[in-house]
Each structure stands twice: as structure tokens, then as C-alpha cells.
């Protein structure tokens, strides 16, 4: 698959740092590196572009928003490939006029001079729009920071629409031989080393299809979406060392590894151009069918305000049989709290009065005359739809194949979710499936496609 890129040509001059990433430092007077000549390197940084045309479906392409491709700063981290892994680090910024767009090319960014380092085989890393916490961690830990050590940071910092989205190398770099570095600045300026980077977050948007329908006897308004169960930590470089892409919590996780997520963005119509997206860090875990838990995955929450068309009321304040209830049109406005009694005949019975719902359920359980059967206990609080809000969960990427795993989300992917149908009333709480195995989407029908950043579309019936 082709992915459109922005090209940033980097000509960066760096002072050689004297420290290494090891706990014990070499004596500079005895360090043979001091006798090695200076060399130079320039770079082409390939940044994924949000406005490219790339889709696995026949749907229109998605331009994204400008903030997703904003470039504010660039850090280059160079390390000797041999111990003590001597570092060379430099920062370039647009505000400081050391990083600028190439004339006539909005996809290319240029620094104003090459990077100077000592001649040796090197590991070279590029970081775009890095915040202070990330930079400090890398400079303190040296090359070890890139050796698949998890780093904690909130998604609002990784997908920062003011300071730019964080990006790193799209794969762990191979060693750059010393012979590929140049002893003349002019040679370095003419022969760029190329590095591709990816955003470290995934994004999502939800749309209703042209034929979107609400089943369940009522109307649905104010549909919203957002990622839930977001990873708190991530690797700077995606772990592709084995057959499957892995995360730090691949085969073991704790509830505290995740934050809940609070995005509630309005669902778009099929013809809309989205202006807001929900973002989430990568979450690559070992999926086992029937065993893997919802608490270990990152998923999309869909909510909506449901108004039942018909409700059950009582004609007797002390009902004793089915004859004491009647079905009426619901005259309450949208956003009114309602209650549900799901009977054994798989019918969702709606109520506006909670006490009536409880009476109805009690008589069903007791097998009263004219009442449908109800098995088990009824808890009114668990069937209360406050302000009419109901929830559905969409587990994306269920058909993923190697090197991806089912229900995993990966950096630089855009999950475009098309909702075809919803089976109301859904669930009264967004936490309805906590500590349960991941199940196929049953009350929401949606298609989801996934493509590196530009588009991954999925259709769902909820």
C-alpha cells in the first residue's frame, strides 16, 4: 500500500555530548573517540501526511485536520553503535528559524546545516514535536530509552493539537555505517539519509450510514463516540522484533495500566467532513478468543439518547396481574430517564416510572396472571437509563492478521467507523462489560476500515 508522506530535509549541526548512556563514564583523556575525525549527515524525514488519498474502501478520502500534520520541532538522537554509545543530540524549531518549509514545497521541512558527529557506526533516531518530559527521559537514558522501555504519557500530550503530534521512527533503525557519513559538509547536504516516522497514536471517527436505522421501538438522538480504556504507556519505537507487533503489556496487564477516556464527540453523518477525532495510544496485546478481557483492550464507546415510542403504565396503583398495566404513547421529551424490564421472551419493556417498572418485574418473577416470564432477579438501578442515555461498545480490528492481532489498535492508524444500525436500548452504563471476555459486537452494526492514518473503515450494527 502506498502512503503519502511529508518530506522534511534536515541539515542539523550538533555539539558532541561527552556523556554516554552507561552508568559509568569513560575518561575523555583515554577515549579513542577523541581521535576520530568529524563527519556530517543530513536527513530526509518522511512524515505521514493526513491529506493523502489512501483507503481500503470505496469511500471518499479523508483530509484529517491540519493539526495532525503540524511540525513544530525536530530532535535528532545519534548514538555510536558500540559501547559507550556516545550520543549526539540536537533540536530544531520553527519558532527559532532553524526549521522551515522548503520553498514551493509544503511537504518538505529543512534545517539550515548538517549534523556534526564523530565517525563511527551509528544508530539514528528522529523525534517530531517532542515534549520536555520525553526529551529529558531520552537524554537521561541514552540509547537505552529506545530499547523497548515503556514510557508513561497521557494521550493529550501525544496528540497535542497545539504543539504537534508526537512522532518517532516507524521501525527500529538498522546501524548506519560510518562510511555513509561524510567528512565534507557539502557532501552531506547533497546526500541525505532517509528516516520515516509515524505518529504514536491511533485515531477514530464515527459516522452514520445513509441507511442508518434504530431498532427497538423508539428514536435515537445525540449520538457520540470516543475511545475507552486507553494505554497509559507506550514504546517510542513500535516493537516489530517478532512475528506479531507487541506492546509492553502484551501478555500481562493491570487495570491501572489504563485510563478510562472521556471523549464524547458527535457522530458524523455519512456526508460530513469530520473536524474532531478521538485519539488513543497503541494497544497491542495477546488476544485469546473467549479468554481475553475487555479490560485489556482499547475500544470505541458509542452513546446516544433514546426515547421509547411506547411505555407501560399502570391503571391500578397496586397491580396484581397483566390486566393492571397498559401500553401508551410516550409523551415525555427526549432526554427523560426511563427504565427497562427485559423479559424471557426477549422483549424490552419500557417505563417512565421506576416504581411501575419494579412492580412489573416483581409480578413477572412471581408468575402472575397475564405477565410474561422473567428469570432471575431484577435490580432497578441496573436497568435505569439516566437522561435516556444508552451505551454500546465497538471492538475494532477483529479480523486483523499477522503481524497484527485481533482487537489490537496500532499507531498511525485511522479507524473509520460507519454505524449501520442500533438495537436499542443498549446498556445504561458505559462500564457494562468490565471484567468480561471480548465479545463480537451484537447490539450495534458497524463497518470499520483501518489504514495507516488515512482511513480504516468498519461498519457496525449496534
Residue map of PLM features:
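Bacterial N-terminal signal peptides that target proteins for export
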Residues: 1-7
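Charged, compositionally biased non-catalytic regions
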Residues: 6, 20-21
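C-terminal motif of bacterial Sec signal peptides marking the signal peptidase cleavage site
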Residues: 15-18
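Acidic/polar, low-complexity intrinsically disordered N-terminal segments immediately downstream
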Residues: 22-125, 130-164, 168-180, 199, ...
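Tryptophan-paired
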Residues: 61-138, 203, 207, 211-416, ...
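Flexible, low-complexity coil/linker segments
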Residues: 146-207, 213-214, 233-256
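Short conserved micro-motifs at the rims of enzyme active sites and ligand-binding pockets
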Residues: 313-314, 427-430
